Amino acid sequence: MNIHEYQAKALLRSYGAPVSDGRVVLKADEAKSAAGELGGPLWVVKAQIHAGGRGKGKFKEPEAGEKGGVRLAKSVGEAAELAKQMLGRTLVTHQTGPAGKQVNRIYIEEGSDIARELYLALLVDRGTSRISFVVSTEGGMDIEEVAASTPEKIVSFSVDPASGLSDFHGRRVAFALGLEGAQVKQCVQLVKNLYRAFVEKDMEMLEINPLIVMTDGNLKVLDAKVGFDNNALYRQSDVMALRDETEEDPKELAASKFDLNYIALDGEIGCMVNGAGLAMATMDIIKLYGAEPANFLDVGGGATKEKVTEAFKIITSDPNVKGILVNIFGGIMRCDIIAEGIIAAVKEVGLQVPLVVRLEGTNVEKGKEIIANSGLNVIAGDNLSDAAQKIVKAVKG
């Protein structure tokens, strides 16, 4: 789960991280009073969406102006006008895709005198099963660009959970960032605070880009992006309260309410599978035979007829889907239950695209019989390879 920048900064402030004072604006008529509560003489007006690249982004609507989603104002009135221009408009960045995201919140904060821009992130390293620090002197730009053009400017290391975080980790970050004197001490404390927030709040990723050195020599968190482990949200009620469902894919949101693991992709063949490994294998074989999967969808091991029906509704709500492949290996899940769910779903949604079903495992013969006697136009797949070839042929011709 992701949160907005202003929420991330409030959270980090509660852990002692140095951040600028700011106000969130939900309505245009709130902007002037919000900016007036801040000191100035410079105000930064930021569009709040769950995507990076806001500063370099462009709004679809001409009324929003030609600049991106991060703008500078030199007066309270100008800050209010900029907020009014951006609220309700659609911001397109390299992370939103061409559709963009509607800006429903604006964050106005005090400007900062910047001497240097740095990069600091914490993330879960799947390879080592540890929390890793990623730091670079090249802050203020996409870390992917730095990794591609000047990888030597990125330093990363992990923290052994057995011994935990120590001061030397903070000093290592400070020296990698070229800090010196009192800045090193500041950095050590900041690293401690960020690490504690990361662990206590079950974060998956904490990115500060940029972390700035101000002209007075002090450090400040200028932008923050935080992602949380969905599997740990049950014990993070305060984090759950920060969730903004308007920023989430409607299909993924609907799937989460039925405990379906769904991720939207860009292809044309919808997939419904039980088990993450089998789902990935199904997507791979679709690509092998020349097509692209439209989604990852794992219905899990205990799917009911209602759950299968909901899965079909989610898949067919994607206008890019030209065909559907159902691939079920019945272990805990019975193939006859899946078959009943498929029939009910096809009848309810009025399926207009080709459907290939491959069943194997518990009660497979019952499942195949239910589908065969349904009178519906469902193509049977003998095995995974056969099913994949049939759906690709049905879609591609």
Swiss-Prot record:
Catalytic activity from the UniProt record: succinate + ATP + CoA = succinyl-CoA + ADP + phosphate; GTP + succinate + CoA = succinyl-CoA + GDP + phosphate
- Cited Pfam families: ATP-grasp_2, Ligase_CoA
Q: Please report the stretch or stretches of sequence annotated as the ATP-grasp domain.
A: 9-254
The note on the cofactor says:
Binds 1 Mg(2+) ion per subunit.
The coiled-coil regions, if any, are none
Transmembrane stretches in the record are none
Entry keyword annotation includes Ribonucleoprotein: no
Which positions bind substrate?
A: 274, 331-333
**Cross-referenced HAMAP family:** Succ_CoA_beta (MF_00558)
Q: Which family does it belong to?
A: Belongs to the succinate/malate CoA ligase beta subunit family.
Listed NCBIfam families? PRK00696.1, sucCoAbeta
- Stated name of the protein: Succinate--CoA ligase [ADP-forming] subunit beta
List the gene name.
sucC
